[in-house]
Design a protein with these regions (language model features):
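Positively charged n-region of N-terminal signal peptides that target proteins for export
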Residues: 1-4
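C-terminal motif of bacterial Sec signal peptides marking the signal peptidase cleavage site
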Residues: 12-15
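Bacterial lipoprotein signal-peptidase II cleavage site
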Residues: 17-23
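Post-signal peptide N-terminal segment of mature Sec-exported envelope proteins
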Residues: 24-45
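Second-shell loop/turn segments in exported
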Residues: 82-90, 142-143, 165-173
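Signature of long, low-cysteine stretches enriched in small and polar/charged residues
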Residues: 98-154
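Surface-exposed amphipathic alpha-helical segments
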Residues: 156-190
Length: 190
């Protein structure tokens, strides 16, 4: 009788369970607006097109000692910022180029890859490099641009969140395209 009760209990417990079904894959639905660009209106030695979902942080940082200017373009909805640094060229172009390239190379520790692409806009006298950094690096995109004579601008994209590449990838791609548009629309003021 005990064996019959035990057998009945085992059958009851095992027969009531649902068959395990794997959960379907879920994908984030991230809708980013189509970029709408307007010309920057800041009092800077350069101008560029800005995405309407971005804003320049209130405080533009001027350094009277070396003439450098720091401008932060904030993307609140994407939790990212593009940090721009302008420096006048004063017989120091090689140093400025080396510093910009070294900043990118500092990310090789965490980066899976760093892909650089040359940028040239003869009409506006803008020449530079755009770097796309793959992997869990702190900065996903970096660039520098110069006219080789008077102006030098560098920029880096950083997110407010821990750099988990899979999570920030869609926003990084969107902002990468914005940074490329900044480079393409960049004009030096004489």
């Amino acid at each position: 009788m005990k064996q019959l009760l035990l057998l009945g209990a085992v059958l009851f417990i095992t027969s009531c369970g649902d068959e395990p079904v794997p959960k379907p894959k879920a994908y984030l639905r991230l809708d980013y607006p189509t970029p709408d660009y307007n010309r920057s209106t800041e009092q800077l030695p350069f101008s560029f097109d800005m995405n309407s979902i971005s804003q320049i942080e209130e405080e533009v940082k001027y350094n009277a000692e070396d003439g450098s200017i720091g401008v932060n373009i904030d993307y609140p909805k994407l939790k990212g910022t593009v940090y721009l640094t302008y420096k006048p060229v004063r017989d120091n172009l090689i140093d400025l180029l080396r510093d910009a390239q070294n900043l990118t190379q500092k990310h090789t520790i965490k980066a899976d890859e760093i892909e650089g692409s040359l940028f040239e806009n003869d009409e506006n006298r803008v020449y530079g490099m755009f770097y796309e950094v793959g992997g869990n690096a702190a900065s996903q995109s970096q660039f520098y641009a110069t006219d080789s004579l008077r102006h030098f601008l560098s920029g880096s994209l950083y997110f407010y969140a821990k750099p988990n590449y899979d999570s920030i990838y869609p926003a990084a791609v969107y902002l990468k395209n914005d940074i490329k548009h900044i480079m393409e629309s960049l004009q030096w003021k004489e």
